[in-house]
Amino acid sequence: MAAYYLAVDIGASSGRHIIGHMENGKMVLEEIYRFENGMVKKDGELCWEFDRLFKEVVNGLKKCKEIGKIPVSMGVDTWGVDFVLLDKNDNVLGNTVGYRDHRTEGMDKEVYKAISLKDLYARTGIQKADYNTIYQLMAVKKKHPEYLEQAETLLHVPDYFHFLLTGQKTCEYTEATTGQLVSPITKDWDYELIDMLGYPRKMFQKLIMPGTGIGHLSDKVREEVGFDLEVVAPATHDTGSAVLAVPANDDDFIYISSGTWSLMGIERKEADCSEKSCEMNFTNEGGYAGRFRYLKNIMGLWMIQSVRHEVNDAYSFAEICAMAEEAKDFPSRVDANDECFLSPDNMTEEVKDYCRRTGQKVPETLGEIATVIYTSLAECYAKTAKELEEMTGRTYSRIHIVGGGSNAGYLNELTAKATKKEIHAGPGEATAIGNITAQMLKAEEFKTIEEARTIIHESFGVKVYK
């Protein structure tokens, strides 16, 4: 009988439980449970509902029992940078504030009193983003110093769910690197940096690598769901899992992990922490097996998702793509990475305002708005591809687009045209596939990453755009 492996993949807008197993030499997936996610306002702060989300994680486990497909292991992956602080009784200190909250405004200046941006990049190789853990912790230090005094443990979001499942406190490496407090040389916390910033050392747990067994379900969870399994750390940063699932058998490719965010980059063995890399705003996030994801964060499909919500989700993404294609000659462009698009009150109005401010034709219809966003994204991808080639001295022949955004056919066509490269789109479920792959590698279903990627290609295929 085939062994089942469970990926719990929680994104910024939804979470899913996806079961995977091997059948006739191919990986087979089944989504068995889905739930909503999103930030809510609490005490004037944008917060995640972790208690509710954990109930949903458990509900999905109960569903496994219900359908008679009990996994041998599971792992949770989420977005990066966000965390909880626990006191000595393992209670959460303060609100579970999310990365789109404004509490980090001005915190970069506070950090730079201790270390310059240039030196910080040289130490960590992580691109500056106001929501990084390093700045969020500074916000806690300035606004709630008592939390840092009481804190015994810092856990990033997937680590917190693994703790609630098993009672074991761990910090997984790929997720930790997103926060800008890990050394790419030692692949451990940069304790000297942590001391410089006045963050308590004791909060930071030992880092573990993806593929590490964390433990079995706690008695409480086991009784509730009716079975036991091993919790295995995948690359818990969702992009780390998605990149593991890129269906390539060589290194002649750029990838885009396309979802709420677009993470565009390459895999490399060593980090590039040079001044030029810093100026170009590339980041060196941790990957599976000690590799680095050398990439750039691009706003991604967040803009389209927001616009869709503003018309009450009346249209599918495919329908919006079709409308955009009809308005394809609309001339205006926006900078997809402009801060104004990070958390606006109304994305549609923000796009119009940007065009107004920059003296361009203002889009009016949904199709025009969508074509401005898609075309701007494709041009941003083309610019980033050129920068990657400049930084590495290489020319890449193709771009692999994985994740939910790989289904946006119109955007893929625009990207092929803008980059003049072959686009290989798929698999759409890359994050869950990568999560399951890390578990399968631990269980020796595959011997190497290369074998796993070949099987992923054979199992799910790709759609090529030229």
Regions found by a protein language model. Give the residues of each.
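Short glycine-rich phosphate-binding loop at a beta-alpha junction
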Residues: I70-T78, T153, K206, R394-G403
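A conserved helix-loop-beta module that forms one wall/lid of the active-site cleft
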Residues: Y191, L197-G211, I436
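N-terminal glycine/serine-rich phosphate-binding loop of ATP-dependent small-molecule kinases
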Residues: M1-G94, A122, Q150, R222-V231, ...
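Glycine-rich beta-strand-to-loop/alpha-helix junction loops that act as flexible
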Residues: D77-D82, P210-G211, S258-W261, R398-S406
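Carbohydrate-associated surface elements
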Residues: D101
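Active-site core segments that coordinate phosphate-bearing ligands/cofactors
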Residues: L6-A7, I19, Y112-G125, Y135-H156, ...
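Short beta-strand-loop/turn "lid" adjacent to the catalytic site in phosphate-handling enzymes
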Residues: E66-G98, Q127-Y131, H162-S183, K206-M209
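Short acidic-aromatic active-site loops that bind/stabilize oxyanions
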Residues: L46-F54, I126, D130, L207-G211, ...
